[in-house]
Amino acid sequence: FVMKREPLRFRDITVEGNENAYIKNGKLHLSLMDPSTLSLVTKADGKIDMTVDLISPVTKRASLKIDSKKYNLFHEGELSASIVNPRLSWHQYTKRDSREYKSDVELSLRSSDIALKITMPDYNSKIHYSRQGDQINMDIDGTLIEGHAQGTIREGKIHIKGRQTDFEIESNYRYEDGKLIIEPVKSENGKLEGVLSRKVPSHLTLETPRVKMNMKYDRYAPVKVFKLDYDGIHFEKHTDIEYEPGVRYKIIGNGKLKDDGRHYSIDVQGIPRKAFNLDADLMDFKLKVSKPEDSNKAQFSYTFNEYTETEEYEFDPHRAYYVNWLSSIRKYIQNFIVEDN
């Protein structure tokens, strides 16, 4: 790679990969004077373009564009934040094969107003949330469901009704002793109930004929726990997180896209400042990273297009644990992008 820089102004990095590199070529422009940009061309002739503009005094912006002919994927999205009139916006369009997805989110920080619109091949949804003083109102208008929530920040009512399936849910909510309690009042082929709090174990359950979701969270147990199980129309997802301070941590996630049957899984386990293991299978890309407790070496291995590459980096005993990791990751990314096997 080639680097050009001018102190306190900009830094430009140009990379050229060989036949084994995942990145064929790329350019990175980091600047304190104008928007920063990243442009990459992958081995499969996919294109990735990203722009981050934190220079503008009025509106900060970040955009991402991905165009992959190999995977029939096109994505374009932009996140913007207005400083003068505090407002956050996110717009994205994704096309995978013949299926198109579109999302639009508008968030006004000053007036506590949120508008969300989602468009999918067989599903549309609009959600609007507003708050005036202590009064709260939310409306849902979708292909599958309609509903609303109305009340104050202390108590209110939630009503959800199916449009294509026969179900109806009515629940009351109230806030007391640091807990948001949701209790079912009327349930026909569905259920919404739970307790959300930072002080006691939390749980939330939503059930309809087409969607089932269960969440559990406990931050005060000796072993901190977060679990999420979701089974919907287009995908299912399972997440299991455990953290025992100073002893161990575990993050396990897996899911399936029901439209094409593809699976993904992520398994992270480790001991703080001593050991780490990552095993990720992201459909077409596999990554393994490990650093055993009884070893001073970190190993990186990835598999893509039936090509596997493994690298190993030794930790310096005189450097901090996380500094060693940052150094190893930097070296691996450099090798992953431009160097020969």
Swiss-Prot record:
Sorted keywords for this record are: Allergen
What name goes with this protein? Answer: Allergen Mag
